[in-house]
């Protein structure tokens, strides 16, 4: 039976500081490290094993995956990293404090930028300190200046179909460590969630989400492992 486990990275430094992170690379906090280790221990205690892993090019997701695999005694597993599993790009909001933005432009505008399905934030300025044009990991990648959730889905799902689906069709057990919005993209597809509803789906940090799949990859069951 194909099994897909999704996990959002543990708490990052900018999660703690309530800042828009997007594609900017920040590491886990001590609490985030503990979350990742606890997730790995939970998976190990429940007897989970994996054949293949996928993650983004961002440190917080990569480190979470490594911490989980360490608890599973499975650091040797093949891991594929790809920018298409990155977090949604928050454009000109990158690095800004969410509450300070609410104070400046109002809660409704910030809600539109954060939670609308197809309205992106303002683009990242050419002179922003958060530009990634010189970041070697994105060599050859056309880096977006901003993204809506719809844009994020537009890169995540083709990657899922091309790279993760073939592994699942071989009945491999797959672990994906990624981000709130890239995981929303996968959950929307797997659980057939409407555009209007997916923006309200909250995905907590460091909590394994288990998808038990039929051979045709239809969903047999979906649950948070901590609840079983």
Go through each PLM region and give its residues.
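Short, hydrophobic/glycine-enriched beta-strand segments
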Residues: 3-9
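Active-site-adjacent alpha-helix immediately C-terminal to a catalytic or transition-state-stabilizing loop
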Residues: 4, 62, 76, 150-219
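A conserved hydrophobic position in a structured secondary element of the catalytic/binding core
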Residues: 7, 105, 178
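Loop-to-helix element that buttresses phosphate recognition and phosphoryl-transfer chemistry
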Residues: 11-71, 142-160, 200, 208
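Phosphate-coordination/substrate-recognition cap region in phosphate-metabolizing enzymes
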Residues: 40-127, 188-212, 216
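Short glycine/proline- and acidic residue-enriched helix-loop micro-motifs
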Residues: 109-151
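Short, solvent-exposed aromatic-acidic interface loops
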Residues: 223-228
């Amino acid at each position: 039976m194909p099994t897909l486990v999704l996990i959002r990275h543990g708490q990052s430094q900018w999660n703690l500081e309530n800042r828009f992170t997007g594609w900017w690379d920040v590491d886990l906090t001590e609490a985030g490290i503990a979350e990742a280790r606890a997730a790995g221990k939970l998976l190990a205690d429940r007897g989970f094993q994996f054949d293949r892993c996928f993650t983004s090019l961002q440190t917080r997701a990569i480190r979470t995956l490594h911490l989980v695999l360490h608890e599973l005694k499975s650091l040797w597993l093949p891991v594929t990293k790809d920018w298409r599993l990155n977090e949604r790009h928050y454009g000109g909001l990158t690095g800004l404090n969410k509450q300070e933005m609410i104070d400046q432009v109002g809660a409704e505008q910030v809600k539109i930028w954060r939670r609308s399905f197809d309205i992106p934030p303002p683009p990242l300025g050419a002179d922003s300190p958060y530009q990634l044009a010189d970041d070697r990991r994105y060599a050859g990648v056309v880096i977006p200046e901003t993204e809506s959730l719809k844009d994020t889905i537009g890169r995540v799902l083709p990657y899922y179909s091309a790279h993760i689906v073939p592994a699942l069709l071989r009945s491999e057990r797959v672990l994906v460590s990624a981000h709130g919005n890239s995981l929303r993209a996968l959950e929307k597809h797997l659980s057939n969630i409407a555009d209007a509803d997916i923006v309200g789906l909250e995905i907590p940090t460091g909590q394994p989400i288990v998808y038990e799949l039929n051979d045709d990859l239809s969903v047999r069951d979906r649950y948070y492992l901590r609840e079983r």
